[in-house]
Amino acid sequence: MIYEQRIYKAVPGKLPAINARFANHTCEFFKEFDIGMLGFWNDEIGASNQLTYITSFESMADREKKWAAFSAHKPWHEVRAETEANGPLVAQVINSFMELTSYSPKPSFKTTLQEKRVYEAMPGKLPDLHNRFSNHTMGLFEKHGIENVAYWTEVVGTSNRLVYMLGYPDLAGREKGWSGFQSDPAWQTARAASEENGALVRVSKHSMLRLTEYSPR
């Protein structure tokens, strides 16, 4: 299974129109062409003007076939022309292809608030990072009320990243969960042991996301 993450950076003021187009048209076209839809999110914190969504396919060949059919679909062209009569809605598209790690659960959502985290591993340390998550971190997350949604690695290009998603009941639950996790002696012991020969993560980025009303659950 291949997952495609797409981030649409909207033209200023056009994010509501992008969401409306997905809700009223694009999602139905995706269903028509059997494009799997994991979720659609807007940023929860900060003045964001972007939509993040993740689709799924059986393979890269399956993705190319279905995306080509969708892109050539006359009703899609008509909707796009109508919704962009006063100018384009999307200023930039950023996409990446991913596959689930061997230890990842099947992606599903218990809440509407997720956190996407991207870890750029130190050179040669990605396997050690995977081991720490599978053997320690995931269990500690669950212990502290943090939902493990999914864990991915990128499959196109030379990537040294781990992309994962967590779930929370609300922002207060996020702060409580992370506070408990970070102060847990079991985490501190696991981290110290795994970093005996140096840090595993070079750069980390995270964003808080809220499922849109039209997103699958």
At which residue positions do the language-model features occur?
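Alpha-helical scaffold segments that form or flank carboxylate-/histidine-based iron centers
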Residues: S48-T52, N160
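An amphipathic, aromatic/His-enriched active-site/gating alpha helix that lines ligand/cofactor pockets
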Residues: P16-L38, I45-A47, S56-F97, N131-V149, ...
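Surface-exposed interaction/gating patches
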Residues: I2-A17, L100-G167, L171-A172, L211-P216
